[in-house]
Amino acid sequence: MPAGERLPGAPAREERIVVHVDMDCFYASCERRREPALRGAPVVVGMGYEPDQTVGAVATASYEAREYGVESAQAISAALERLPRKADAPDASAAGYYRPVDMAYYESVSESVSEILHGLGDPVREVSIDEAYLDVTDRTAWDVAAGFGRHIKQRIARSVGVPASVGIAPDMSTAKLASDHEKPDGLVVVPPESVQSFLAPLDVADLHGVGPVHARALRERGIETVGELADADPYVLEAAFGERGREFHRRARGADSRPVEPRGKPKSLSRESSFDGATESFDRVREQAAALSGAVADRASRTNASYRTIGVKVVTPPYDVQTRAESLPGPVDDPALLEAVSQSLLDEFEGAAVRKVGVRVSNLVFSEREQATLAGFSGDETGDGGGHEGGACGGAGRGSCGGQTTLDEFT
């Protein structure tokens, strides 16, 4: 939808529609995406469970694993006491599948989710690898917000293969509470007229920003629920907790006025696209990469960004992520060069089956002035001052991928 164009019936700007997307047990969901046989089984992602390891912790536990008392940040030894490894007890009915943390892979999946979200919301605020806010005020209306939320969930599930919980509300704090309300794979819509009734019965500790220490202090003052916090005297709260007390009161009333804003300037710009299954037609791969290069170049131009590095990402079956990049003598804004370098970087993958291809620029420089092209620098058109850098993340390289992309790249 063009900037500034509103959907017929969309609310006025002051009636915001904010979406919070939270990927359920994200690391475990990624492992199930890679190993579909793990669906429905207890999955624990962490380090320290191998026989030669003595120290480690749980990064993520699936909901099935949580039923056995396994929790995030728990010592791996405690997790193993509650839920032994299937590899150690193959015949046990109560055993789980333990997998090592593979950040490169999780970041790749997160990038795919990010690509979808940036196409559905404007603006988008990514707060972590598995969580984001979208302002969709101009994209939908309250009477069809539930359908819009289902569309987000379905796009992520079908295109990426991981589940998400979605909360929709007039403000960021309430939207986050809504996404937590029916996990996993939930969808909760809280329209403006329902905010107070939704918030009031919730435990005060559930309110966004209220940690265990403040929750205990509030309970000592007789405040147990969000509704009681909303009814409290804001001056008394401010006297007890400072400005944070005022903020607690605003959020308890559904009056969180924070705008959905991106976190600073991006470190990279990228676009990527998946094929139906895996394609062995490299002409299709090159054609898609050319289109992606054009989209990235357009985004760089619109944001007054020049770039020192051009890279590509290729995902081959089953879900092996490989990246290649070339550094340039200096920052440029040159669409023709971007396409030429990205096509050159793809050469080594000719003949491979490809599930997904992506193009990115990084090492960005932002300026209001006219950007340079490579002709403004000494050296030849291949960027001789740089060279290739990259890495592959396959089965043997899980958890340690030299040159692998990071979350700030390819987003």
UniProtKB/Swiss-Prot annotation:
One of its GO terms (molecular function) is magnesium ion binding. Residues 384-402 have a biased composition (Gly residues). It comes from Halobacterium salinarum (strain ATCC 700922 / JCM 11081 / NRC-1) (Halobacterium halobium). Binds 2 magnesium ions per subunit. This is DNA polymerase IV. It catalyses: DNA(n) + a 2'-deoxyribonucleoside 5'-triphosphate = DNA(n+1) + diphosphate. The gene is dbh. The record marks Y27 as: Substrate discrimination. Residues 248-280, 376-411 are annotated as: Disordered.
